[in-house]
Swiss-Prot record:
An annotated GO BP: translation
Pfam families associated with the record: Ribosomal_S15
Organism, as annotated: Mycoplasma mycoides subsp. mycoides SC (strain CCUG 32753 / NCTC 10114 / PG1)
Protein's job: One of the primary rRNA binding proteins, it binds directly to 16S rRNA where it helps nucleate assembly of the platform of the 30S subunit by binding and bridging several RNA helices of the 16S rRNA.
Lineage summary: Bacteria, Bacillati, Mycoplasmatota, Mollicutes, Mycoplasmataceae
NCBIfam families associated with the record: S15_bact
Family: Belongs to the universal ribosomal protein uS15 family.
Superkingdom to which the source organism belongs: Bacteria
Protein name according to UniProt: Small ribosomal subunit protein uS15
Recorded GO MF terms: rRNA binding; structural constituent of ribosome
Entry's Gene Ontology cellular component terms: cytosolic small ribosomal subunit
């Protein structure tokens, strides 16, 4: 789970304003943070199947946001994957 402070920092970094939470970039950044937290959890708890399912759902959700961003603005897409270190 991403803390409130981490989420607020991501919103400010990718959205510009703390009320601008709906941007695809902000959603992708928050999902990426949640995915990394779940990945770390699964490294320690390998048999936690419900968490693995949640991880896969979040990865798919992030993929949808990335696909949307590619259709709308390729430059913003490249900027986001560069900042977050996401593979294409």
């Amino acid at each position: 789970m991403v803390s409130k402070e981490q989420k607020l920092a991501l919103i400010k970094e990718f959205g510009g304003d703390e009320k601008n939470t709906g941007l695809a970039e902000v959603q992708i950044a928050i999902l990426t943070a949640e995915i990394s937290n779940l990945t770390e959890h699964l490294k320690m708890h390998k048999k936690d199947i419900p968490t693995r399912r949640t991880l896969l759902k979040k990865v798919a959700q992030r993929r949808h946001f990335l696909d949307y961003l590619v259709k709308k603005d390729v430059n913003r897409y490249k900027e986001v994957i560069g900042k977050l270190g996401i593979r294409k």
